[in-house]
Regions:
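Core catalytic alpha/beta fold that binds nucleotide/phospho-ligands
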Residues: 1-107
């Protein structure tokens, strides 16, 4: 991973299989259930599933082995892993990973 290039993935929310979303860790599914707006819930589930798939390809480790969280500003972080970024707008979600430093992605 140390010399890996930046990696980007994107998806339409409607195109992500339900199985990918249902395979997320319980804590992430529970957080999604706390969103009142269905669009926001679907964006969150799609973003997490897409990010975990990207991290699996990027690191070679199982998708659910990555400990994801947020920094003090709400930006997603992967404990002990690459720098990550998530963006969503309407029905599109994008994720990015970089070997070190910071990364930002926007739609």
């Amino acid at each position: 991973m140390a010399d890996s290039p930046i990696s980007v993935a994107f998806s339409k929310v409607q195109d992500l299989p339900e199985a990918a979303k249902s395979g997320l860790p319980a804590a992430e599914r529970e957080r999604a259930d706390s969103f009142k707006a269905a669009q926001r819930r679907d964006q969150y589930l799609c973003a997490r599933a897409l990010l975990r798939a990207l991290l699996q390809r990027y690191t070679g480790n199982p998708a659910n082995s990555h400990e994801l969280g947020s920094d003090d500003k709400g930006k997603p972080v992967c404990a002990g892993g690459p720098a990550i970024s998530i963006a969503h707008s309407g029905g599109i979600v994008m994720c990015a990973a970089a070997p070190h430093g910071e990364i930002g992605i926007d739609i």
